Amino acid sequence: MKRNGETKRRRNVAEEAEQGEDPAMWENLDRNFRQVQSVLDRNRSLIQQVNDNHQSRMADNMSKNVALIQELNGNISKVVNMYSDLNTSFSSGFHGGKNGHDGGGAAGTRA
């Protein structure tokens, strides 16, 4: 199913390029959304581990939750920053016009 979505995105990038849009901007946004999704997927895994540890009621597992929750909190901060960077990149791409976008941007600097 992901492959079909990738194909559609690539086709949309090609169509936008034909219409004079900035395909580099869309590719950059797509790449950064995938980075955000990766962190969100990791958070889902962390939450499941925390739940499993909590349900086990074993002292060792409960103590592991401290580090897992700290990582989860750090990841939430990363996601907030990544979305902020995406917003800036997206706004710059549209307000600056296609000539004002350099294809890079701060959104690609965090992971």
From Swiss-Prot:
<comment type="function">
    <text>Component of the central CCA1/LHY-TOC1 feedback loop in the circadian clock that promotes clock accuracy and is required for sustained rhythms in the absence of daily light/dark cycles. Part of a corepressor complex consisting of ELF4, ELF3, and LUX involved in the transcriptional regulation of APRR9. Increases ELF3 nuclear distribution and localization in nuclear bodies. Required for responsiveness to continuous red, by regulating phytochrome B (phyB) signaling (including during seedling de-etiolation) and gene expression.</text>
</comment>
<dbReference type="GO" id="GO:0042753">
    <property type="term" value="P:positive regulation of circadian rhythm"/>
</dbReference>
<keyword id="KW-0539">Nucleus</keyword>
<dbReference type="GO" id="GO:0042803">
    <property type="term" value="F:protein homodimerization activity"/>
</dbReference>
<comment type="subunit">
    <text>Homodimer. Interacts with ELF3.</text>
</comment>
<dbReference type="GO" id="GO:0042752">
    <property type="term" value="P:regulation of circadian rhythm"/>
</dbReference>
<dbReference type="GO" id="GO:0005634">
    <property type="term" value="C:nucleus"/>
</dbReference>
<keyword id="KW-0287">Flowering</keyword>
<dbReference type="GO" id="GO:0010017">
    <property type="term" value="P:red or far-red light signaling pathway"/>
</dbReference>
<keyword id="KW-0607">Phytochrome signaling pathway</keyword>
<feature type="region of interest" description="Disordered">
    <location>
        <begin position="90"/>
        <end position="111"/>
    </location>
</feature>
<dbReference type="GO" id="GO:0009649">
    <property type="term" value="P:entrainment of circadian clock"/>
</dbReference>
<dbReference type="GO" id="GO:0000122">
    <property type="term" value="P:negative regulation of transcription by RNA polymerase II"/>
</dbReference>
<feature type="compositionally biased region" description="Gly residues">
    <location>
        <begin position="94"/>
        <end position="111"/>
    </location>
</feature>
<feature type="region of interest" description="Disordered">
    <location>
        <begin position="1"/>
        <end position="26"/>
    </location>
</feature>
<dbReference type="GO" id="GO:0048511">
    <property type="term" value="P:rhythmic process"/>
</dbReference>
<comment type="similarity">
    <text>Belongs to the EARLY FLOWERING 4 family.</text>
</comment>
<dbReference type="Pfam" id="PF07011">
    <property type="entry name" value="Elf4"/>
</dbReference>
<dbReference type="InterPro" id="IPR040462">
    <property type="entry name" value="EARLY_FLOWERING_4"/>
</dbReference>
<dbReference type="GO" id="GO:0010114">
    <property type="term" value="P:response to red light"/>
</dbReference>
<dbReference type="GO" id="GO:0009909">
    <property type="term" value="P:regulation of flower development"/>
</dbReference>
<dbReference type="GO" id="GO:0009648">
    <property type="term" value="P:photoperiodism"/>
</dbReference>
<keyword id="KW-0090">Biological rhythms</keyword>
<keyword id="KW-0597">Phosphoprotein</keyword>
<dbReference type="InterPro" id="IPR009741">
    <property type="entry name" value="EARLY_FLOWERING_4_dom"/>
</dbReference>
<dbReference type="GO" id="GO:0009585">
    <property type="term" value="P:red, far-red light phototransduction"/>
</dbReference>
<dbReference type="GO" id="GO:0005667">
    <property type="term" value="C:transcription regulator complex"/>
</dbReference>
<protein>
    <recommendedName>
        <fullName>Protein EARLY FLOWERING 4</fullName>
    </recommendedName>
</protein>
<dbReference type="GO" id="GO:0048573">
    <property type="term" value="P:photoperiodism, flowering"/>
</dbReference>
<dbReference type="GO" id="GO:0009908">
    <property type="term" value="P:flower development"/>
</dbReference>
<feature type="modified residue" description="Phosphoserine">
    <location>
        <position position="45"/>
    </location>
</feature>
